Amino acid sequence: MKKILSVIIAVLFIGIANGQTLLIYGGSNHDVYLGKLNASRYDSESIWNEYGRYGSKYNSNSIWNEYGQYGSKYSSYSPFNEYGSNPPVLVDSQGNFYGYFTANRYRPKRANFDLVNIICEYHEKIREDVGEWYDKIF
């Protein structure tokens, strides 16, 4: 089962990994920078760099901090709240909007692409070993 999941994930993300780097912004006015969604695990601003500010599960502005407002499944500002009303947005470096980063399937303009869907579905497992999941996905 793990092998099948790994292969499916790898195939789904090939296009995204090579595409435009997406930036995550949270907060009520979407003015709180939360890191880069699909950047290298060695990028200091990547959510996949577990030693960096945005990839650490201990940083208050990390989506991987289950006790923080951007990582808790109970916070309206978290992408992992299935009923969240203020989820983060995804934009590129020019500010083009790619959708809301949210597990809330009823949210209009929700980013509905594979990387976001996998992160929302497996966030609890991912936060336990961000590096391992990066290797599976990219």
Predicted regions and their residues:
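Sec-dependent N-terminal signal peptides
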Residues: 4-15
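Repetitive, compositionally biased segments used for assembly/scaffolding
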Residues: 18-138
